[in-house]
Amino acid sequence: MLRIKAFPRIHISLIGMNSDGYRLNGGIGFSIASPTLDMSFEPSDTVDVIDMRESGFTPEELDRLKKHLEKIIAKEMYGTALCCTICEGKIQSHVGFGSNSMIYQSCIEALLVLNHREYNENDVIALSGRGGTSGIGINTYFKGGLILDTGIANRGQRGLAPSSTFMSDVGPKPLILTELKLPQWDLGICIPSIVPKTEDEERAFFKTNCPIKKEEVESILYEVVYGITSALMEEDFDVFCKSIDTLQYTKWKSLERQLYGEKLIEAESVIRKAGAKCVGMSSLGPLLYFFGDDIDTTVDQIKKVMPSCICLKTSFNNSSRTVEYD
């Protein structure tokens, strides 16, 4: 049996969501140590995927994954398929963990191992079809740490849309500008009792809100480079927190946050009152991440006020996924 343990990512923000610049997309995010996504794989004659998570893939999403794997098996002439089990855990789909990329890449890597193929990171990324919009999750899977990418050159070949839109398009991958090992800081994550957005709703959001203005992108970029990345490199916790908070009110992130209205604002208020120094929303949410001086106490207070939420302490992760083969 083959086992892969992957670490989720927090996606701080997309960046170049304008259509009149040198590049498209780009983003910044980091890997966290827990909760982990644990998957097991066995060789099989046919592809099968069993999702044991309480909030996992829809039947349509499971079917899409199986068809993607079957297409690769046929194209690459693999002799062995696989039976994949996504184990129980707190990694939900479509809340901001980057679970889709983790699952697709884990399945591709398992296929390569079970078929005794030599491979590298780029092979797994290319076959997964992920990373068409953001290079965060596809790279933290292998590297951990913080990733800052500048998207792809704007040559009119793509529009602005979520990564799932580009899965059949083997195009250029985002350019990684910075890979950074992170300090030993704790943080908390909170998944409020808010219904997450579906892939169709995510596509509709991009269609409605893209492009944004170049000057709005510049505001995001200032916080990303001069604020968040620089503060992490210098381990300046106060500036990091200030920049995370400021970023929430830049154009793109504020549009994402508006999807959840007052419910998100109320959850964030509870987190701040519990002691958080800064609060951000990962990707399209509704997962909120937060930093502070005493994460344990903050988590306990949040659970008392919002008992229906999922809230836990974690930390930055600088490690790759783990692969074990019996």
Label each PLM-derived region with a short phrase.
Residues 1-95, 109-122, 132, 317-319, ...:
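ATP-binding N-lobe of GHMP and related small-molecule kinases
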Residues 2-5, 13, 19-27, 120-277, ...:
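ATP-dependent small-molecule kinase catalytic core of the GHMP/sugar-kinase superfamily
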Residues 32-34, 100, 182-186:
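Short Pro/Gly-enriched coil loops immediately N-terminal to beta-strands
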Residues 62, 98-101, 292-295:
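Conserved strand-to-helix beginnings and helix N-cap segments that scaffold or border functional pockets
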Residues 88-113, 132-141, 279-284:
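Glycine/serine-rich anion-binding loops at beta->alpha junctions
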Residues 286-288:
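Conserved PLP-binding catalytic core of the aspartate aminotransferase-like
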